[in-house]
Curated annotation (Swiss-Prot):
The keyword Protein transport does not apply. S-adenosyl-L-methionine binds at G46, G47, H48, D65, F92, D108, H115. GO terms for biological process: rRNA base methylation. Keywords: Cytoplasm, Methyltransferase, rRNA processing, S-adenosyl-L-methionine, Transferase. Its EC number is 2.1.1.199. GO terms for cellular component: cytoplasm. This is Ribosomal RNA small subunit methyltransferase H. The gene is rsmH. Specifically methylates the N4 position of cytidine in position 1402 (C1402) of 16S rRNA. Disulfide bonds: none annotated.
Amino acid sequence: MKSDLETPLNLEELAFSHISVLGREVIEGLAVRPGGHYLDVTVGGGGHSRLILEAAADVRVTAVDQDEDALVAANKNLAEYSDRIQFIYSNFADYEFPPNTFDGILADLGVSSYHLDQAERGFSFRQAANLDMRMDRGRSLTAADVINNWDEAELADIFFKYGEERLSRRIARRIVERRPLHTTTELADAIASSVPPKYRYGRIHPATRVFQALRIVVNDELKSLETFLDKAPNALVPGGRIAIISFHSLEDRPVKHGLRNSPLLKVLTKKPIIAQEEEISNNPRSRSAKLRIAEKLV
């Protein structure tokens, strides 16, 4: 197996399993063919890559992820396909896309259930952990750096821009009053204490949008997505397809416009493909998923 992955992590300690969102729709959308070469730029635990490898004979996959834990888990989960898969440790924005190479490219955006379940990664406000939120732990900026060092106006701006949080100024003011904040639960408590009771006990936890904003900033997600959308189409062979799954409007809007505005692509999904009720009942995360597909012009 070709691999750029060299890490001493214990495979048995990992719980990186991933239920593939819109799996059938992705395989149909990519039109996986025998002998094809496919690029999965967010391999995670390997769920979608497995479906691609199983969809036709002699398929090859190049699997990219910026999280070393994910690559270790995918390496283990897909060991039976070791002669047909190559793992690369990289953010998809930094990946050097070889021109006219792939029959299909897949990106499954956003945070995985693994990241939310692993308290020490700092993505979830439901368990106490250090304010980290780095997908790639080689990055220097953490959520704690942002929360404790950025000024009130900057915090309010990112909460509004990347979390679409209407109470961004009020929340930023309370955070500045209470900092330094070191853990996810300390931050969540500060946020909850800054909002009206009806907001505090609503269906969505008041920290949800702030945590989304911090994750986007720490991982530079939207800039990375913009770079990916610019670079990826050239890596497709003529007639090759790109499939992108997004989970909120801040992701879906640039995907929609990026695919539509690329001179190399023809959009195949007039409206995004969404999960059916059966999938939603089995995997609630799929409720907000939107799949868009485009094909490279000949």
